[in-house]
């Protein structure tokens, strides 16, 4: 996959993508990440990329022409078609199903806004989709772009050392439930012991426990996800057992 990022701070994205899963994906040739700076395509001695908004008001608005020229160069760098995605709090919420859709693309172009935003005419003419990573406002779209790069990259074939790792993540699978708790060594600690079932070696019992914990944790923390999940009789039985066994105060 190739991801082009249009940003006034392309080095920010490069730094975020240099580590962990995304860094390994680039080393393995599974991800090509390229940053483009609109300031390189601005005119005049000051290479201005923003100006005051019509109608007055605070802040500055990113100008059409530097963005248009930058996008033109970015799109010409690879022959494959690429949707232009603007990171915006007004966009479609980034979810795991949406991430899976985007992960199937061979290429995408991410646009990071700054200041009060981008001239609406550019968004109308050049942007295919707006995506939001949450109901809050950041100083710019770079953090959102870094999140999207990470989410999409880890879904590429061969990126994770264990493909099952992604399949067992929260929001994955047909039900989209939260993940179950995980434990490692030591089995006994001052802060608690590992559940006995996980040390039993009984794979059937372990699978049942994990499924029940996934259902229960979703019910406790994100109950609205259960409204869209397709649960069979066994799932409903496991969830009911979880509810009955829940100790007072554990609802947190």
UniProtKB/Swiss-Prot annotation:
It is found in: Cytoplasm. Pfam families: tRNA_m1G_MT. Gene3D superfamilies: 3.40.1280.10, tRNA(m1g37)methyltransferase, domain 2. CDD domains: TrmD-like. It is an enzyme of class 2 (transferase). Its main location: cytoplasm. GO terms for cellular component: cytosol. GO terms for molecular function: tRNA (guanine(37)-N1)-methyltransferase activity. It catalyses: guanosine(37) in tRNA + S-adenosyl-L-methionine = N(1)-methylguanosine(37) in tRNA + S-adenosyl-L-homocysteine + H(+). It comes from the Bacteria. The keyword Ribonucleoprotein does not apply. Its EC number is 2.1.1.228. One of its GO terms (biological process) is tRNA N1-guanine methylation. Keywords: Cytoplasm, Methyltransferase, S-adenosyl-L-methionine, Transferase, tRNA processing. S-adenosyl-L-methionine binds at residues 113, 133-138. NCBIfam families: PRK00026.1, trmD. Homodimer. Belongs to the RNA methyltransferase TrmD family. Specifically methylates guanosine-37 in various tRNAs. This is tRNA (guanine-N(1)-)-methyltransferase. It comes from Xanthomonas campestris pv. campestris (strain ATCC 33913 / DSM 3586 / NCPPB 528 / LMG 568 / P 25).
